[in-house]
From Swiss-Prot:
It comes from Escherichia coli (strain K12). One of its GO terms (biological process) is response to butan-1-ol. It comes from the Bacteria. The gene is yghW. InterPro entries: DUF2623 (IPR022574). Pfam families: DUF2623 (PF11115). This is Uncharacterized protein YghW.
Length: 95
């Protein structure tokens, strides 16, 4: 059994930019969710701004057609309402 989430997470942690929706269509939802979380975590490590990383995760979640509740669970862990608001702001921004 392949760990698609783990592979996506590692790819996101190494990525310098996020791909367009067209470029990720070949990947399954678990891989894309892992990528979004890895990429947003890397952004947080680089900037120290949890709200910015949540905003970017919201944008990518919408862009990649992911279930927002599954991605939002990651941001609920730190019990920050503002982080969730920034996630939703990014999610609503992407059309």
């Amino acid at each position: 059994m392949n760990n698609h989430f783990g592979k996506g997470l590692m790819a996101g942690l190494k990525a310098t930019h996020a791909d367009s929706a067209v470029n990720v269509t070949k990947f399954c939802a678990d891989y894309k969710r892992g990528f979004v979380l890895g990429y947003s975590h890397r952004m947080y490590e680089k900037t120290g701004d949890r709200q910015l990383s949540a905003w970017e995760a919201g944008i990518l979640t919408r862009r990649y057609g992911l279930d927002k509740e599954m991605v939002m669970d990651f941001f609920r862990e730190n019990n920050s309402c503002s982080t969730l608001r920034f996630f939703m702001a990014g999610y609503r921004l992407e059309n």
